[in-house]
Amino acid sequence: WATWFRYPHKYSEVLDALPKLVAEVEYAVRAHDWSPEACRLASSVYRLARPVLKHAGRADLSGLLADRAMRYAERTGDPILIGAASWSVGQAMLTGDMPEGALDFVTRAAERLEPLLADGTPEQFSVYGGLLLCAAIACVRTGDPWRGRQLLHGPAREAAKRVGDGKNYHGMVFGPANVAIHTVSLEAEAGETGDALRLADEVDLAVVPSLERRTTFLYQVAHCYEQRDNDAAVLVHLQMVYRQCPEEFQYRRPARHLVETLVRRARPTFAAEVREFAARVGVLG
């Protein structure tokens, strides 16, 4: 998890390690007769594998990996681990273009955690809040952005106050900054690019402990600028992504698509710089 969230060469390192990790946890589960600790570790590995393979172009495996994470989480009987696995299932449903199913699934999962919140720990509020963030994005994809806004500005924001920034329980990176990032994402997906860019100016990436969250946010902002034909701003934000994680342009197709679009339509005043950047990230030549 630390490599995935922190290191510039996260794709090559994690993809190289994943096959061995999966084999080891599968062996451990059976060698220890499905013990809670072995199942906890297996669930964690499959929750990690889902976003890694999704961004590396194997989104078709999201459902299978999330299902494995849930199967092992349920064997532990730990409601927080089950909640984290439910978040992974919800994300897989969004990837598979099933927002209605995702919304129902993660909403029910969040409701099951509510009895724990009266004296809840930051970890419990983090998992609960992560489920709400997934639900908010599902709302906008089902055509109900107002409900998504209510989730973000209400219970998600309140839960984030109980967690604070700089935390990363169960790989969910939940906290005030991630709520703000999802607010930008929701407005962008709702077609409100002006509002999305205005809100993006208020996001402090310095307190976000996840490289994936930071680069995804920068992609979202770049895409908003692309829709407003501000190609210079698109280039600036893609350069910011490259400085943080050069491998993004090797593995993430949407990033390459943004560069390809820039190459086609960049104005003469900075077209040469766009071509130089495209060559550097491997889109040209």
Q: What does each model-found stretch correspond to?
A:
Residues 1-285:
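Conserved binding/catalytic microenvironments
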